[in-house]
A protein has these predicted regions:
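Terminal amphipathic helices with adjacent charged low-complexity linkers/tails
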Residues: 12-13, 90, 103
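Cys/His-rich short segments
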Residues: 2-64
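Long, charge-rich boundary regions
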Residues: 46-100
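Short acidic (Asp/Glu) and glycine-rich catalytic loops that position anionic groups and cofactors
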Residues: 1, 32-33, 49-53, 68-69, ...
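Membrane-interacting alpha-helical segments
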Residues: 28-41, 95-110
């Protein structure tokens, strides 16, 4: 048997008009025919937690020891305002060691994991920024087409990005919007100063094959 319709209309959920965390009015956005409820407040506490969680995740900076609960504690104590504050947590050594669930060993392991994360590939850094629609696979494609320093990406145009396989106009606009934002540029400069970023080899175009004739030998079955 299959349920085709709820005739009683019971358990119908109302769409919240405000964010339950920051109480900003929510917005419905339509992407590819699907609607998503969105909090437009860039300073929303819940979005801040998710941004930090994303930054330290396995496919991004891959910093072991940072659960979402730990990040919340650090943010609530005022130790983390922006993601680059992670790299100066050693100034709170005593306070961190005195937290519930922490001690000298946990602190040492966390600081070592933070130090290890400073050696990172370009695509992981791009992915860690949380640019709308830019997953790790797309970040890899962009970085291989344009292996630039973080500060140079602000010079890329939508037209240039559209030459990357699989990227559409909305993703290209999202990428350009992020890198041309002045606040984001400050963050990118700080990350450039902190991290040692390995650039991938540039993928060359197929222009070298233009005008050439190829003869295929053998039989086709």
């Amino acid at each position: 048997p299959q349920i085709q319709e709820n005739l009683t209309k019971s358990n119908a959920l109302s769409i919240p008009s405000v964010c339950p965390v920051c109480h900003q009015e929510t917005e419905l956005i339509n992407e590819n025919g699907s609607e998503f409820l969105f909090c437009p407040n860039p300073k929303c506490y819940a979005k801040k937690i998710k941004a930090f969680t994303h930054f330290v995740s396995r496919d991004a900076l891959n910093i072991d020891g940072f659960s979402e609960a730990t990040l919340e504690k650090f943010i609530d104590h005022g130790w983390l305002q922006k993601v680059t504050d992670i790299f100066s947590l050693s100034q709170y050594k005593e306070e961190i060691q005195n937290l519930d669930g922490f001690g000298e060993k946990s602190y040492t392991n966390l600081i070592q994991a933070i130090e290890d994360s400073k050696q990172v590939t370009l695509e992981r850094v791009i992915y860690s920024l949380g640019i709308k629609g830019i997953g790790l696979s797309m970040a890899k494609l962009i970085c291989r087409k344009y292996p630039l320093s973080l500060n140079e990406y602000k010079n890329l145009s939508v037209k240039e990005l559209l030459s990357v396989d699989g990227i559409g106009e909305k993703l290209a606009e999202s990428f350009v919007e992020y890198f041309t934002d002045s606040e984001n540029q400050d963050l990118l400069q700080q990350l450039s100063n902190i991290l040692t970023i390995a650039l991938p080899e540039k993928i060359e175009s197929n222009a070298s094959f233009e005008g050439k004739t190829f003869v295929i030998t053998g039989s086709l079955t």
